[in-house]
Amino acid sequence: CETRLYRLLHYHSLVKKVSPTPILVVYALVNRSYVLDLQPNKSWIRHLLAQGFDIYLLDWKSPTRMDKYVSFDDYVNSYIDDCVEIVQNNNSADKITLHGYCMGSSMSAMYTSLHQEKIKNLVTIAPVIDTSKDSTVIANISRQMDIDKLVSTIGNLPPEKLYECYSILKPFKQGVNKYFNLIENIDNESFVQNFLRIEK
């Protein structure tokens, strides 16, 4: 299934005995979901498939100017809900497992609280549930910004600008240090391959 703002990928179990409860993985809006399946020996998706789960991965596309007014309500109650229903229908399942990562965890928690009748299990990794307790550098900076003015001026923040914001969290590690590590490990083919996969 593919729409303008997302595509739903389906991975079939690697074993004969398949769990009756399929998993829908909801990834973050600002990163790419392929990080969960970079290579066979470092794949969260492959690990779940080997445990007998049928996996669906919600891969968000970058919003464009025409998506300026798309809201969290649209993401949670339209797009995620559409995917949940596809997973339910494909697997003849009344309830599914919703597995979120980062912002996907927050959206999955919202969805589960609103649609408990469709969710058997909620699994979250790195969720932000209570933003009032977030004391990271980026949270403190964002509290000083006029978000409404930012959105009305430029619309959606381009992905490269979001990356710049996230690099503020660990500027040396995100900026220079990763390249020093590459130089130090340039003769290690496995390290170089992993670096290239993540940095592409």
Task: List the predicted regions and their residue ranges.
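Alpha/beta-hydrolase-fold enzymes
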Residues: N89, A93, M107-K200
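Short, surface-exposed "cap/lid" segments of acyl-processing enzymes
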Residues: C1-T64
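A structural signal for isolated positions on well-ordered beta-strands in alpha/beta enzyme cores
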Residues: Y56, T97, N121-V123
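Short secondary-structure capping/turn micro-motifs that flank functional sites
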Residues: T64-R65, V128
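Gly/Ala-rich beta-loop-alpha elbow adjacent to hydrolase catalytic centers
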Residues: H99-G104, S108
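Conserved catalytic-core motifs of eukaryotic protein kinase domains, centered on the activation segment
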Residues: D67-Y69, S135
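Alpha/beta-hydrolase active-site loop
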Residues: Y69-N90
